[in-house]
């Protein structure tokens, strides 16, 4: 049995390069993951400070203190010392502080703009998302967009807030996770090249912590009207368009007459429209669309909902919306009058490898507000709007837009050109062929976002109190800094 690598110590004077010397990549990752927020709070130096301190520690000051100690330790190794340098130069008055009490005291005096600057530097240092070496450590103690739905529902499952299971990247190449990761890049190219060719965009995001409270964090898939400043920090235009990307593995088909999905897709390709789209969706046993009659409660089974009876495939009984569902009713009212944009893409076999938009039409489909995708986008909107509000280098007027962009793909065949392009960008020859893109707008009613964020924040507080009972927490600042709806 292989020996477990020795965890690193945030407070030791040992160089991290020496600690990691001779270790495999996986063991290095395990050591870096041990530098988590939970391990920081459980460290003897932090516990001693908690026992002796006459103050009640609070967020986001504690998160900022952790960021300082973490990047003091890993900054040189990952080639990013800007986070630590900003603390020293702009928060600590030019002094490199070493003890918990002094660092926390300085962090508790930081204003929101300073915290925003730190969060932007952390985002820049963690680009490439889960492939980044400190990703596992940073997501500890954070309610991310993938955990937000669970936190709001306050379920007691294995998805922990503190000390979560590490992210694994050894996905089976033919499985849905690997499919989603490789096809996500294709959807980004479709959005940047075909839908937003003249708008500044960013294709690669790091981990965006909330500067207001330190308990929420997201990483975006794609956004238009976003640029970086001279220091490489993200700047979101108030009229930016943010996309959560999904790639539907269960709709992947082969271009063969015996494939029922292909037969339905062929009809959609030849005669684009709502009826052909419905046939395509219902070509599998568990479609991505659910018909829900007016005044009925949708299930949580999939992310698209239709009110119009033309989408009904087989009649099913639905529960009625009751006064207990007022928040759901609010969210439905804000989304049910919207429509999705459907883009049918050209077949590269017919266009010498060029993939472009063959047809575009509207479909009366809206987001299911009970589905986890809705909650993911809601949390993303909250963090993006914090960054916009705290960035002194951009105008304040504008209204960000949020979407779910869903890509549909088919398997490659021997007749497909080896070299396919989307605009001027080459398509990876090992990636499936994109066939369809559906863009669904997502809206949040006034007050609903605030209530849902408060529910998640309250759950975080209870979890922190249970996990770290020796800390005399002050949650008042946290409750006061859950963002309000605009």
UniProtKB/Swiss-Prot annotation:
Q: Does the keyword Secreted apply?
A: no
Q: What is its EC number?
A: 3.1.-.-
Please name every pair of cysteines joined by a disulfide bond in this record: none
Where does this one sit in the cell?
Host nucleus; Host cytoplasm
Q: Where is this site: Required for function?
A: 184, 221, 244, 246
Could you tell me which InterPro entries the record lists for this protein? Herpes_alk_exo, Restrct_endonuc-II-like, Viral_alk_exo
Enzyme class of the recorded protein, top EC level: hydrolase
One GO molecular function term of this record is: endonuclease activity
Q: Which UniProt keywords apply?
A: Decay of host mRNAs by virus, Early protein, Endonuclease, Eukaryotic host gene expression shutoff by virus, Exonuclease, Host cytoplasm, Host gene expression shutoff by virus, Host mRNA suppression by virus, Host nucleus, Host-virus interaction, Hydrolase, Nuclease, RNA-binding
The protein's matches in Gene3D superfamilies, at most eight in alphabetical order, are given as: Herpesvirus alkaline exonuclease, N-terminal domain (1.20.120.860)
Question: GO cellular component annotations, sorted alphabetically?
Answer: host cell cytoplasm; host cell nucleus
Tell me the Gene Ontology biological-process terms attached to this UniProt entry. symbiont-mediated degradation of host mRNA; symbiont-mediated suppression of host gene expression
* Protein's job: Plays a role in processing non linear or branched viral DNA intermediates in order to promote the production of mature packaged unit-length linear progeny viral DNA molecules. Exhibits endonuclease and exonuclease activities and accepts both double-stranded and single-stranded DNA as substrate. Exonuclease digestion of DNA is in the 5'-> 3' direction and the products are 5'-monophosphate nucleosides. Additionally, forms a recombinase with the major DNA-binding protein, which displays strand exchange activity.
HAMAP family (alphabetical): HSV_AN (MF_04009)
Family assignment from sequence similarity:
Belongs to the herpesviridae alkaline nuclease family.
Q: How does it assemble?
A: Forms a complex with the DNA polymerase, the DNA polymerase processivity factor, and the major DNA binding protein.
Entry protein name: Shutoff alkaline exonuclease
Species annotation: Human herpesvirus 8 type P (isolate GK18) (HHV-8)
């Amino acid at each position: 049995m292989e020996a477990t690598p020795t965890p690193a110590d945030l407070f030791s004077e040992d160089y991290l390069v020496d600690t990691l010397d001779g270790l495999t990549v996986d063991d290095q990752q395990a050591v870096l993951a041990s530098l988590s927020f939970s391990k920081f709070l459980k460290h003897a130096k932090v516990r001693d400070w908690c026992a002796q301190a006459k103050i009640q520690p609070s967020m986001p000051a504690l998160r900022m203190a952790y960021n300082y100690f973490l990047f003091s330790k890993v900054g040189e190794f990952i080639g990013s010392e800007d986070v630590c340098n900003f603390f020293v130069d702009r928060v600590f008055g030019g002094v490199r502080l070493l003890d918990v009490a002094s660092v926390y005291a300085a962090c508790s005096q930081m204003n929101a703009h300073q915290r925003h600057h730190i969060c932007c530097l952390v985002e820049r240092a963690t680009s490439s998302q889960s492939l980044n070496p400190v990703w596992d450590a940073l997501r500890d103690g954070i309610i991310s967009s993938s955990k937000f739905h669970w936190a709001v529902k306050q379920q007691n499952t294995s998805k922990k807030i503190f000390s979560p299971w590490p992210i694994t990247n050894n996905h089976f190449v033919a499985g849905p996770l690997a499919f989603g990761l490789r096809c996500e890049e294709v959807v980004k190219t479709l959005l940047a090249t075909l839908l937003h060719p003249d708008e500044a965009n960013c294709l690669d995001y790091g981990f965006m912590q909330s500067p207001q409270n330190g308990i929420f964090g997201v990483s975006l898939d794609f956004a238009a009207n976003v640029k970086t400043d001279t220091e490489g920090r993200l700047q979101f235009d108030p009229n930016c368009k943010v996309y959560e990307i999904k790639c539907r593995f269960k709709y992947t088909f082969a271009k063969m007459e015996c494939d029922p999905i292909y037969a339905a897709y062929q009809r959609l390709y030849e005669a684009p429209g709502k009826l052909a789209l419905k046939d395509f969706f219902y070509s599998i046993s568990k479609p991505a669309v659910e018909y829900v009659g007016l005044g009925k409660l949708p299930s949580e089974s999939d992310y698209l909902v239709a009110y119009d009876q033309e989408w009904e495939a087989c009649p099913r009984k639905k529960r009625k919306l009751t006064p207990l569902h007022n928040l759901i009713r609010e969210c439905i009212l804000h989304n049910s009058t919207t429509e999705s944009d459907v883009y049918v893409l050209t077949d590269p076999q017919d266009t010498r490898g060029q993939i472009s938009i063959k047809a575009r039409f509207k479909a009366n489909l809206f987001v299911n507000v009970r589905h986890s995708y809705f909650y993911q986008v809601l949390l993303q909107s909250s963090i993006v709007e914090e960054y916009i509000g705290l960035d002194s280098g951009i105008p304040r007027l504008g209204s960000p837009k949020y979407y779910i962009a869903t890509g549909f793909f088919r398997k490659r065949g021997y007749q497909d050109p080896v070299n396919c392009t989307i605009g001027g960008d080459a398509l990876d020859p090992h990636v499936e062929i994109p066939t369809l893109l559906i863009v669904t707008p997502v809206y949040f009613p006034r007050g609903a976002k605030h209530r849902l964020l408060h529910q998640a924040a309250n759950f975080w507080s209870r979890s922190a109190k249970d996990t770290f009972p020796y800390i005399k927490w002050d949650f008042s600042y946290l409750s006061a800094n859950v963002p309000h709806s605009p």
